[in-house]
Amino acid sequence: MTNTYTAYSVLRDVTLRDGLQLTGKLLSTERKVEIARQLLALGVPELEIGSMARGDLVPPMANTLEVITALTPDELDRCWVWVATPRHIEKAAAAGAKKFQYCLSASGKHNQANIGRTTEASLAAFPDAVRNTERVGGTIELCIATAFTCPFDGEVPVERVISIANDPRTDGAADLVLCDTLGQAVPRQVTRLFDAAQRRTPQRRMVFHGHDTWGLGVANTLAAIDAGAAMVDGSLGGLGGCPFAPGASGNTSTEDLLFATQPSWFTPNVLESMVGLTDKMLAELGEPNRSKSAQGARSEAHVFPWVIRGGTQ
């Protein structure tokens, strides 16, 4: 198997934010911290641990500040928090966070549904978000949701995404995150957008956030890596989706991405531990496991080293 995963392309597990937010169920602070620490101990390079969205609107995120407070500074160096306003950064930073994913949508209608303001208003606030980040010595990403399609307006033009990434008000963003929020993109579209962004926008670390709605989450992620993505997002068991994007389903499975790319730290023993962690969490949430790799790991093809020894489920 050719390993396309390089030292410059790492996985970020987004289970504790994008994975949980659509479930409607709030895991305890202690349980979230336990999951975060288990993932970090397994070798997952980076995590997304929560959102500063209002708890009454997105109940699974109601204890994000408590999760941040419970983690150590060293752990938080590998953990991102979703934010949509400068005030979100102030509050998360006061709890100890240093990495902020500032999200807005290429689609104005989705931005209004997801964040409650226009895309222009989100862009206008970005310089203040950068200043708040710099005050704590942190890092901020510019995350563009609905970079391919919108649940309300359909296909999003490449030029729309490029114009946002090129807006001088986004100066200070270390990363550019391009999101297939609905999971409707195909690999050639991912390649085209990443190529355009790298050629025509400021030099930033490129990140891909995909969903597996149409079964192309892994293929799209591999296309993004080949086109220069330095970090890619996944969620345990393919859990998740945007509550404000009708038609969106789960994220691309962390297990599937890791099996496809096989970074040096990802071994059959790590996969077995990850499958166990996922199964326990999904049972608590009453959610199915959508990971094909988890299914394969439980198969009876025991001569294959990635199959879990000791039985199937």
Positions of predicted regions on the chain:
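Catalytic cores and adjacent flexible loops of soluble metabolic enzymes
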Residues: 1-313
